[in-house]
Amino acid sequence: MSAPKKLYIKTYGCQMNVYDSERMAETLGGQGYVETQTPDDADMILLNTCHIREKAAEKVYSELGRFKGLKAEKPDLKIGVAGCVAQAEGEEIMRRQPLVDLVVGPQSYHRLPEMEAKAGTGEKVLDTDFPEEDKFEKLKRRPKAKRGPTAFLTVQEGCDKFCAFCVVPYTRGAEVSRPVDRVLREAEDLVERGVREITLLGQNVNAYHGAGPNGDMTLAQLIWELDKIDGLERIRFTTSHPNDMMDDLIEAHGTCKKLMPYLHLPVQAGSDKILKRMNRSHTAESYIRLIERIRAARPDILISGDFIVGFPEETEEDFQATLDLVEEVKYGTAYSFKYSTRPGTPAAERAQVDPKEADDRLQRLQAVLTRQQREVQDSMVGRELGVLFEKAGRFAGQMVGKSDYLHAVHVADCDAKIGDLRRVRIVSSGANSLAGELID
């Protein structure tokens, strides 16, 4: 029997890319590939890329440049670029980096076996189509090998919102939702492999409308179906749009015990002028009222958000409106970025904010968000939380897991095993994690 071929995958960007990388590795496993943690001994290298920000795209070209020596030493080494940079830039990748053998978009990776075979003959292969066939239907059922206690599961892809700053509609395509039975089957397979927590993924996941036995089902209805799976203890979902936060989903946060009290609900800005120019289709006030309704259903829910500062034509007054919104909502965690021009998006054609001013605003916003995050973490001290243990800690006898609220929790002298869901009393908080002790 010949030795297995080795596959190195490097993943950039969002959780969906993590999921896609897993599926690509499984797909190429049928061609005799096993994963390796280093590119040096790989027979094939795949970079699964992100195109949300300019720096993310440039990192890919920088990484490819580092493989030139490796390709010279191993001419048969196959190098591929997948994901959203592949979709957006296509042939340009091969022009800038001729060492690349194949380029595959996020809707085409089910065809990787055929692409890999063609690349093995010396042919340059490009596949960035939006095929009519459903890639999930073409992917093989996931393997039965044991895995860690948490998993991502893509249920929806693409976006129809066309925010003025965003490339997702162009790189991932229109919104599509997977049929309910396919999602449930994959979830059951994951639970059989040891998974106890599943995070449902979508670029606009709460717009989910997958086909069910009696017509399309909402995300809330899908969650209630997942709730019936024995052995699945926790359900999360990300990322959501405020306009698709429907009543039944809000209600599920208050009544479904498996749905965790954590919600990532980006707002991007607090100025109605900027929100309109972003094409967000909601106002700051409607977002705040929505948060109030969600907290009425689940008072202890932790809200997470995304923010962009320095969006074209943003004034100091506009930025102050964002700070005001942050102070009113009080986020448990949030992600903030300086606006990054993406070619082909409407915002790229508008008057840009001075970079130094944008940097200053980002620092000021992050200071407020960091304070709020620490206040929320400090409020956990003394509470008893459920913790799903995921890995051993850095110190002997230490275990690390995630709380209901997605905080990392470190427990010393811990007899819990990976995959155990235990009650923990929080005894202290740090900058990015909590420390606790087992109470059962």
From Swiss-Prot:
Residues 378-440 form the TRAM domain. GO terms for molecular function: 4 iron, 4 sulfur cluster binding; metal ion binding; N6-isopentenyladenosine methylthiotransferase activity. The gene is miaB. This is tRNA-2-methylthio-N(6)-dimethylallyladenosine synthase. It comes from Ruegeria sp. (strain TM1040) (Silicibacter sp.). Its main location: cytoplasm. One of its GO terms (cellular component) is cytosol. [4Fe-4S] cluster 2 binds at residues 159, 163, 166. It catalyses: N(6)-dimethylallyladenosine(37) in tRNA + (sulfur carrier)-SH + AH2 + 2 S-adenosyl-L-methionine = 2-methylsulfanyl-N(6)-dimethylallyladenosine(37) in tRNA + (sulfur carrier)-H + 5'-deoxyadenosine + L-methionine + A + S-adenosyl-L-homocysteine + 2 H(+). Monomer. It is an enzyme of class 2 (transferase). Residues 5-121 form the MTTase N-terminal domain. Belongs to the methylthiotransferase family. MiaB subfamily. Its EC number is 2.8.4.3. It holds the Pfam family UPF0004. Its cofactor is [4Fe-4S] cluster.
